[in-house]
């Protein structure tokens, strides 16, 4: 792939100067379509209740699940609503899960005067053996028991369950299924290798010199300022860069100034100001050479709830001079040379990690694809806008590349769907912690990590640069 292309050319760094300097034209993007319009907010009204988004989600998902249930259990299976259930009668029910969790943080529990409880300490996971599942439809709810993995499932998941109502009033689940992968348009064949670079978690403003050096190495490689002719030729095959959130460090979110007297903070500025200036300079270097899509993340200066709206262009006076810079939403979807990308900055996957037993971020990514919903835990444990007409987080179409940013480590996997769908799953690691980005080959849907690290004290040769996969 990328490294193999670089190795095909002779090393030129130590060769005598030449009058004819090699020039490499960047591979053009034949077609590009930004398909993130469903995530753009027109009106911003927070006066509505969140019950509407659950009702809309169930209405939109019900046809997919009824069809999937008949494929899974046979066309003769009866699909009923909860109000139509009869004791001991086996049937299928479609509904939305609610997971009752004793350890789930609750502001009502914390402020309750009669309980006088101390706030719960933060946990990495909130699952407990006493967790229970409740299935809801438009009219009723019923507790579930039987063959169903309580610890793995989360609130907001729409699924179909097969079983019967028992004398204790609970629904005994014998089997269950999800909507599975959405239909997918095949990607057109490409005749040459071209790459999309995925980066997340630059963490600017954190004060780490190693991270800053790695970021500059990344910029220099992409723009062809680093390496010999082999590396520069390979860099010319990078057709687009996607920055998947957390461009600023968590340390820029300090709110200590709120608790200080005004005369102490009158001449100080927010820590994020210098970080945004630094980001503007980095985007200037990148967008002068290659198209760049910038997604916001948890620590970036935009709205906190999903879908996060694009960063404001006034923060980047230098980089916005180039039309190659695109400020996009989180989640973000686009079609690049016929390959459909869909990704988030990682909040959806991190939230499911906290409220389920799934440990692997790549497994969670695949699970959301099977459930056919980007963020089922929103709005219960993850903030989102109170939509009431449609739920934009439902997959209308299966992507070819599905990624999430700011994960602890790199991972990639190709999965197949029941209708020959092919999807590349990518977990993009936090760059400030790992100095690692990901390259996706649009022609083959292969993915490889590429690492950028500075010289350590133990490095005695150029091998310490750590540039490459």
Swiss-Prot record:
Gene Ontology biological process terms, A to Z: DNA biosynthetic process; DNA replication; DNA strand elongation involved in DNA replication; DNA-templated DNA replication; error-prone translesion synthesis
* Impact upon substituting residue 224 to W: Loss of POLD3-binding in a yeast two-hybrid assay
Pfam families with a match to the protein in the record: DNA_pol_D_N (PF18018), DNA_pol_E_B (PF04042)
Q: Which residues carry this modification: Phosphoserine?
A: 15, 257
Q: Which Gene3D superfamilies match?
A: 2.40.50.430, 3.60.21.50
Record GO terms (molecular function): DNA binding
N-acetylmethionine is carried by which residues?
1
Q: What outcome follows a substitution of residue 293 to N?
A: Found in a patient with a syndromic combined immunodeficiency disorder; uncertain significance; affects protein stability; strongly reduced interaction with POLD1 and POLD3; in peripheral blood mononuclear cells, after anti-CD3 and anti-CD28 stimulation, drastically reduced protein expression levels, despite transcript levels similar to that of wild-type controls; patient's cells also show strongly decreased POLD1 and POLD3 protein levels; no effect on DNA prolymerase activity, when tested in transfected HEK293 cells
Say if the entry is tagged with keyword DNA repair. yes
Assign the protein's first listed, main location to one coarse class: nucleus
State the compartments where it is located: Nucleus
List keywords of the entry alphabetically.
Acetylation, DNA damage, DNA excision, DNA repair, DNA replication, Nucleus, Phosphoprotein
Q: What Gene Ontology cellular-component terms does the record carry?
A: delta DNA polymerase complex; nucleoplasm; nucleus; zeta DNA polymerase complex
- Detail the disulphide connectivity of this chain as listed in its UniProt entry: none
What job does this protein perform? Accessory component of both the DNA polymerase delta complex and the DNA polymerase zeta complex. As a component of the trimeric and tetrameric DNA polymerase delta complexes (Pol-delta3 and Pol-delta4, respectively), plays a role in high fidelity genome replication, including in lagging strand synthesis, and repair. Pol-delta3 and Pol-delta4 are characterized by the absence or the presence of POLD4. They exhibit differences in catalytic activity. Most notably, Pol-delta3 shows higher proofreading activity than Pol-delta4.
Subunit (UniProt): Component of both the DNA polymerase delta and DNA polymerase zeta complexes. Component of the tetrameric DNA polymerase delta complex (Pol-delta4), which consists of POLD1/p125, POLD2/p50, POLD3/p66/p68 and POLD4/p12, with POLD1 bearing DNA polymerase and 3' to 5' proofreading exonuclease activities. Within Pol-delta4, directly interacts with POLD1, POLD3 and POLD4. Following stress caused by DNA damaging agents or by replication stress, POLD4 is degraded and Pol-delta4 is converted into a trimeric form of the complex (Pol-delta3), which consists of POLD1, POLD2 and POLD3.
The UniProt similarity line reads:
Belongs to the DNA polymerase delta/II small subunit family.
Protein name as catalogued: DNA polymerase delta subunit 2
Organism expressing this protein natively: Homo sapiens (Human)
Name of the coding gene: POLD2
